[in-house]
């Protein structure tokens, strides 16, 4: 906000943030600020959702980077925040509890090369997190090597776990063959929304549909996971989704 105030008289580089703020301001919803990540951000109808990242160390780590980038805006009129590899450390990892069912959504979070106080290392060494055993895991960062640690995954996943992930096809393709093999070794019940080795024909409708300024993806399928009364997970695939074992 301080950076926004300083550049308001010049060019407004924070239009998206301000638009979102104004939309929320004009609604009747309450905006809660959580001081303790041990409290759920949602708790109703037997469903609890916890945000377990980013932490205070991440705030401090990224604050220095954002200040440096904001300085470029103020003094050099740059129009882009170039966070590079560090961008993913601000990812919001979610724990969802539905009765006895435990789900972990990994977002795009990665392991930092040297700093164990941020990223996945900080989460996995947290005592409260270590109490969890997850039934379903949304693999972070499209199954990249920098998001995976076999020891940690084995520790926080249940024996009959289900893994699901989405590929990345812009630039370097993720997951690569090495990581596909590794993830299959960790969990035989792993699924991906599309096979990057295949080319999918565009449907005419998808050439016209747009979401904002981006085209909707035409190659991804869906991975639907349900649980019966005994807590057993059942996986239903649609579209171009396939078991990772077929790759």
Where do the protein language model's features map onto the residues?
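Active-site-proximal loop/helix segments of hydrolase catalytic cores
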Residues: 61-175
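Short, aromatic/basic amphipathic alpha-helical patches
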Residues: 121, 174-187
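Short, charged, surface-exposed secondary-structure boundary motifs
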Residues: 172-176, 201-204
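Flexible, acidic/histidine-containing loops and adjacent segments that form or flank the divalent-metal
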Residues: 1-104, 110-113, 184-247
